Amino acid sequence: MSKVISLLSSKGGAGKTTISTNLSQGLFRMGKRVLVADSDPQASSRDWSLQAPDEYNMVPVLGVGAKTMEKEIASVRDSYDYIIIDGAAKMEAAKMVPTIKVSDLVLVPVQPSSVDIWAIEDLIDVLKARLDAVGKPLVNFLISRQITGTVIAGDVFEVLKEKELPILNARTSQRVVFAEALSAGLSVYEAEPDGKAQQEIEALIEEVTGLIDG
């Protein structure tokens, strides 16, 4: 049975689709059976998949509905090693509960800004309530789109620690290649092999798989 990893945030622009597509493609290139489940009405991951050049072997993407999430994931769960759910943007936290229920791990990407932290307060409450009730899923913050050479990511790290949920050591940075790859239907593995962005994704994969497979 597959492990389900969800990228959830109540705020748009947090990097959910960028992380979902790159994380999944990295696992796919490792020989894993991987599916991206796109639950965002904006269909960003599905659009990404449609842009992929024919010469590249890219991870498959399936559109799923937030209301039918549990049934749809159950129907494909035995066919993959990992299912990565690209969560809907700007959705009320309470409506994310079906996605949370099917997840083994929820990653909450947070840009280094106070506004981003304020925007996910309700989601944090929902996740904590689920953990208190049933003891799962695993939940981790992921600092995303940090600007290298600044101290603000460190400041946000200190604020996130007060939320009493773990924070991944792996982070993603604000790099042009992430945006360029997404627009071209690629991941950083194809767009800039062995570059710094790929190194960040590989560090993320190592940490995430250690959490859910370890």
Regions found by a protein language model. Name each.
Residues 17-21, 120-121:
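Motif I (Walker A/P-loop) of helicase-class P-loop NTPases
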Residues 120-135:
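Conserved C-terminal guanine-recognition region of P-loop GTPase G domains, centered on the G4
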Residues 36, 85, 108, 141-143:
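Structural beta-sheet core signal
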Residues 179-202:
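Inter-lobe coupling/hinge region of RecA-like P-loop helicase motors
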Residues 147-149, 157-187:
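Beta-strand-loop-alpha "switch" segments that mediate conformational coupling across diverse proteins
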Residues 94-114:
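Inter-motif core of Ras-like GTPase G domains
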Residues 4-10, 14, 21-97, 133, ...:
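P-loop/Walker-type NTP enzyme "switch/lid" segment
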